[in-house]
């Protein structure tokens, strides 16, 4: 059994940040469960381009407001606490945070934990 609190992660190597977001990595590849789980903060007023060409991501918004645009179609979906989206087609998308957003994110294959986005908006597929 694995039990962790957010306090166990903040300020450690399991917390990764960029200018627009901070991701606290609860479950990673080393845990050998087939997925990873992050608690991610998206900064208010930011626009973020992402394209997870190597991963499937499910996201559940638990705080804040914003929107996500599926770039291939121009479809825009409002996001608020209680909204989930699944990037099951490796969708290129833009995430716009109106307020700070807190998201619970599940990745498959699992993240190693040190990933940051490339210039093309995706996480490299790391093995260690």
UniProtKB/Swiss-Prot annotation:
Could you tell me the EC number(s) of this protein? 4.2.1.108
Per the record, the GO terms for biological process are:
ectoine biosynthetic process
Q: Which UniProt keywords apply?
A: Lyase
EC class of the enzyme, as a word:
lyase
Q: Which reaction does it catalyse?
A: (2S)-4-acetamido-2-aminobutanoate = L-ectoine + H2O
Mention any Pfam family matching this sequence.
Ectoine_synth
Coiled-coil spans are: none
Pathway it belongs to?
Amine and polyamine biosynthesis; ectoine biosynthesis; L-ectoine from L-aspartate 4-semialdehyde: step 3/3
This protein's superkingdom? Bacteria
Q: Which GO terms describe its molecular function?
A: ectoine synthase activity
* Entry function: Catalyzes the circularization of gamma-N-acetyl-alpha,gamma-diaminobutyric acid (ADABA) to ectoine (1,4,5,6-tetrahydro-2-methyl-4-pyrimidine carboxylic acid), which is an excellent osmoprotectant.
Family assignment from sequence similarity: Belongs to the ectoine synthase family.
This chain's protein is named L-ectoine synthase
Its taxonomic placement starts with: Bacteria, Bacillati, Bacillota, Bacilli, Bacillales
